[in-house]
Amino acid sequence: MSERIAEVSRDTLETQIRVRINLDGQGKGQFDTGLPFLDHMLDQVARHGVVDLEIVAKGDLHIDAHHTVEDIGITLGQAMARALGDKKGIRRYGHAYVPLDEALSRVVVDFSGRPGLEYHVDYPRARIGDFDVDLFGEFFQGFVNHAAVTLHIDNLRGRNAHHVAETIFKAFGRALRMAAEPDPRMQGTTPSTKGSL
């Protein structure tokens, strides 16, 4: 399997974003988005997905964080799709349950080539510090649309909003890791009876 590394830039009137991902990395992350709590969540994806991930973003945060968060999701999705290439030899499906104290979340992913998001999360409060938790849904929708994956995210329980978010992002990283992992029994084979994804 060739190197699974991609770098993608997105420049609009609202945001300038650069994402670099190495799917076969060591879990190293570098983040500068202007949104410290989002940086913390992205670090969970890198660490628990065991991918090397660099994200630099400048956005119109003087308005709000919506454009920046959504566009980071879009650009990460594009980088993921590019790094995976034709998807031959991968496991395709991944899932993870992750607890953190009282919180528990489940994430299931399919590198199906069909964008679809089922996002079922009720945060116990609207903000974590200065971060609007509604924007996590926008992040995942942007990712799904541009990575062309089916993604199910369910928070099963949790009273602490920080814990809820952290379990989701850790589970997201672990599910991506499982789905993108090379399957030694599927070398050179597309994991679909259609012959393509």
From Swiss-Prot:
Q: Name one GO molecular function term.
A: imidazoleglycerol-phosphate dehydratase activity
* Location relative to the cell: Cytoplasm
Top-level taxon of origin: Bacteria
Question: Which pathway does the UniProt entry assign to this protein?
Answer: Amino-acid biosynthesis; L-histidine biosynthesis; L-histidine from 5-phospho-alpha-D-ribose 1-diphosphate: step 6/9
Q: Which SUPFAM superfamilies match?
A: Ribosomal protein S5 domain 2-like
Q: Tell me what reaction this enzyme catalyses.
A: D-erythro-1-(imidazol-4-yl)glycerol 3-phosphate = 3-(imidazol-4-yl)-2-oxopropyl phosphate + H2O
Per the record, the major location class is: cytoplasm
What keywords appear on the UniProt entry?
Answer: Amino-acid biosynthesis, Cytoplasm, Histidine biosynthesis, Lyase
Coiled-coil regions in this chain?
A: none
What do the Gene Ontology cellular component annotations say?
A: cytoplasm
GO BP, sorted A to Z = L-histidine biosynthetic process
| Name of a matching Pfam family | IGPD
EC number(s) per UniProt? Answer: 4.2.1.19
UniProt cross-references to NCBIfam families, sorted A to Z: PRK00951.1-1, PRK00951.1-5, PRK00951.2-1, PRK00951.2-4
Q: Which HAMAP family match?
A: HisB (MF_00076)
Q: Which family does it belong to?
A: Belongs to the imidazoleglycerol-phosphate dehydratase family.
Full protein name:
Imidazoleglycerol-phosphate dehydratase
Gene source species: Thioalkalivibrio sulfidiphilus (strain HL-EbGR7)
